[in-house]
């Protein structure tokens, strides 16, 4: 494990003593009083996000919803029991037509008559239970796969949050080092300005030369403010991704850690897993459509009491009579206007498209892995090169300052050397950013990025 601490070289060379102390002080005081700010490791930030990030909470709720939907479909196999009751009072009893021939009258003639009593009470308990229903079995299979999809979607969101927080954390570290670089350059510029002012007092340089150094110092101060503002914005974004209040004062570890030449074992990416689960879902839906042509069988039973009442004295009464039955109901779909056939054709085309999408995701993933590996290798080499460039630029700057004191170097030479040093420092930081991003991307594409890694 390589570390970029308060050194900017793989070798044992360090900043000059003043610059080194200033760098340490700046890292410690960057967010104010260090006693008021907790130092968070990258893993702590990720663990906090896993608990408080709202997107992850939403996806966890979606997983719970899919679990409840599966239980809901399974509950359709459980017997259903219902109770019904009603009371009816007839102001006018219902009429019936009686054939007169039943009483010796002529054929084809009827006589109206009223039957029944005014008070009618019915109470029934009914039971129904599916014995064989292909639609229910298909729905159970489909909701199980839908639950798997929601779990994969949660994993995908988890990886995205991991990726986002890691990038933000690295950006905060990089911005901290940029501020330290600017502070170091401010120290060098302040020294140069002091020397130039002394030389001006001795009439060895002009006021214009002093103004150039003063301008460079002001430019560095402006750059310092811009970086500090960017740092605050990135910190707020990091807090948002972690799900903690913006008012909470945090600081990240100053050390930038990265591992070189690590080979990741390739696992199916979360996107590939998601497309595969969607393919299984479509296949399950297709099978459900085909099975909808099969008959369904259910058991039914009922028990009840029917009451009849008459309330006129002296013949008033209220009597109840039982009624019950049990049976089997069979439902067979015969013809629905080719609707099912058209739905099956549509689902077959959807499966074909999803299979093509799965192949596309696999090919795209292989391409992105190859590109990420190349990018990581290039940035790894760039880090080594820029480290040497920083050491060389420091030597050139220090030698130029000495030559300027001896009168053999001009102010322009010093400014050029200083700019070269700053450029080397910025190139070094950019190389680290590119390496860490390429490494994160490679971990994501190979299925190695997660909260557990």
At which residue positions do the language-model features occur?
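Bacterial N-terminal signal peptides
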Residues: 21-33
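Periplasmic alpha-helical coiled-coil/stalk elements that build and connect Gram-negative outer-membrane
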Residues: 68, 152-154, 158-268, 375, ...
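Small/polar, glycine/serine/threonine/aspartate-rich low-complexity segments that form flexible
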Residues: 84-125, 258, 301-332, 453
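A short glycine-centered flexible hinge/capping loop motif at secondary-structure junctions
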Residues: 200-204, 404-408, 445
């Amino acid at each position: 494990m390589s570390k970029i601490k308060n050194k900017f070289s793989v070798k044992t060379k360090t900043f000059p003593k003043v610059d080194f102390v200033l760098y340490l002080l700046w890292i410690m005081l960057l967010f104010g009083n260090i006693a008021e700010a907790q130092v968070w490791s990258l893993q702590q930030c990720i663990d906090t996000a896993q608990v408080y990030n709202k997107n992850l909470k939403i996806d966890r709720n979606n997983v719970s919803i899919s679990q409840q939907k599966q239980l809901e479909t399974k509950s359709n196999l459980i017997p259903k029991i219902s109770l019904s009751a009603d009371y009816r009072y007839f102001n006018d009893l219902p009429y019936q037509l009686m054939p007169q021939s039943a009483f010796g009258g002529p054929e084809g003639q009827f006589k109206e008559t009223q039957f029944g009593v005014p008070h009618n009470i019915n109470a029934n308990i009914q039971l129904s239970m599916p014995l064989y229903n292909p639609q229910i079995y298909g729905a159970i299979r489909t909701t199980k796969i839908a639950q798997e999809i929601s779990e994969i979607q949660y994993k995908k969101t988890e990886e995205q949050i991991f990726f986002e927080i890691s990038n933000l954390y690295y950006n905060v570290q990089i911005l901290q080092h940029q501020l330290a670089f600017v502070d170091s350059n401010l120290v060098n510029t302040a020294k140069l300005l002091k020397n130039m002012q002394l030389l001006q007092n001795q009439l060895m340089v002009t006021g214009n030369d002093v103004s150039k150094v003063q301008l460079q110092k002001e430019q560095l101060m402006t750059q310092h403010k811009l970086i500090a503002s960017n740092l605050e914005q990135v910190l707020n974004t990091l807090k948002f991704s972690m799900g903690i209040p913006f008012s909470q004062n945090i600081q990240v570890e100053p050390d930038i850690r990265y591992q070189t030449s690590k080979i990741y074992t390739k696992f199916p990416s979360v996107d590939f897993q998601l497309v595969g689960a969607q393919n299984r879902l479509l296949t399950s839906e297709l099978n459900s459509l085909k099975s909808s042509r099969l008959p369904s069988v259910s058991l039914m039973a009922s028990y009840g009491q029917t009451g009849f009442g008459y309330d006129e004295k002296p013949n008033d009464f209220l009597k109840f009579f039982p009624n019950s039955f049990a049976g089997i109901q069979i439902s067979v779909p015969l013809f629905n206007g080719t609707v099912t056939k058209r739905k099956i054709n549509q689902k077959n085309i959807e499966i074909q498209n999803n299979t093509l999408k799965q192949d596309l995701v696999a090919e795209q993933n292989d391409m992105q892995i190859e590109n990420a590996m190349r990018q990581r290798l290039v940035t790894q080499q760039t880090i080594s090169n820029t480290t040497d460039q920083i050491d060389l630029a420091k030597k050139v700057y220090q030698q130029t300052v000495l030559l300027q004191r001896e009168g053999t170097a001009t102010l322009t030479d010093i400014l050029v050397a200083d700019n070269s040093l700053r450029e080397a420092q910025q190139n070094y930081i950019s190389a680290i950013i590119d390496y860490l991003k390429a490494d994160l991307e490679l971990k994501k594409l190979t299925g190695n990025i997660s909260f557990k890694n």
